[in-house]
Regions:
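Hydrophobic ligand-binding cavity/cleft-lining segments
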Residues: 1-35, 39
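Generic structural detector for well-ordered beta-strands
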Residues: 6-10, 47, 61, 97
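Alpha-helical scaffold segments that form or flank carboxylate-/histidine-based iron centers
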Residues: 11-12, 49, 124-128
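Hydrophobic pocket/interface hotspot
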Residues: 16-17, 26, 44-46, 62, ...
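Short, flexible helix/strand-to-coil boundary loops that buttress conserved ligand/catalytic motifs
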Residues: 20, 30, 75, 137, ...
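A solvent-exposed, acidic/Ser-Thr-rich amphipathic alpha-helical stretch
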Residues: 32-47, 52-53
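Hydrophobic-ligand binding "helix-grip"
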Residues: 35-37, 55-103, 112
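A conserved amphipathic terminal alpha-helix motif
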Residues: 113-147
Length: 147
């Protein structure tokens, strides 16, 4: 009940960390507009700008920021209703783990907690997010290669 994606990036851990945790960079590759910096224990808000998903809010609670090692947040299972109170909805945990490797960084993204979602929504949420993380791994790789 977890999604795990790994990618070898040809940049140092410090550069990947910056792309993940500086919200001004995160929005470029993730394709979202976020209202302010990531702060542990605080809610990060905004909206998705990825084509076809612009109607979705960006809402996450930052869980951990272990310098150049781990960045994690929980995000709620979104309703298609743009006015829904998503922050009180069941959520999953997203973890970005960074590991130095020869020639760059191994980035591992894990999303877990799908068992917390309503039974009727689990399979679709898992499939949608599995495909989404495949796309996001390509996005961050392209972003870092070009900048």
């Amino acid at each position: 009940n977890r999604i795990v994606k790994r990618i070898e990036l040809k940049v140092p851990v410090s550069r990947v960390w910056q792309a993940l945790t500086d919200y001004r960079e995160f929005v470029e590759w993730f394709r979202a507009k976020i209202d302010g910096p990531f702060v542990v224990g605080e809610v990060s808000t905004g909206h998705i700008t990825y084509p076809g998903y612009e109607h979705l809010k960006w809402e996450a609670v930052v869980q951990k920021m272990e310098h150049e090692r781990l960045f994690s947040f929980t995000w709620p299972h979104h309703s298609d209703d743009p006015n829904a109170d998503n922050l009180n909805a069941p959520s999953t945990l997203v973890e970005f783990r960074l590991e130095p490797i020869k020639g760059g960084t191994l980035l591992t993204v894990t999303e877990s907690g799908f068992e917390n979602l309503p039974v009727d929504d689990r399979d679709k949420a898992f499939r949608d997010n599995e495909g989404g993380w495949t796309e996001q791994m390509t996005n961050i790789e392209t972003y870092l290669a070009n900048g």
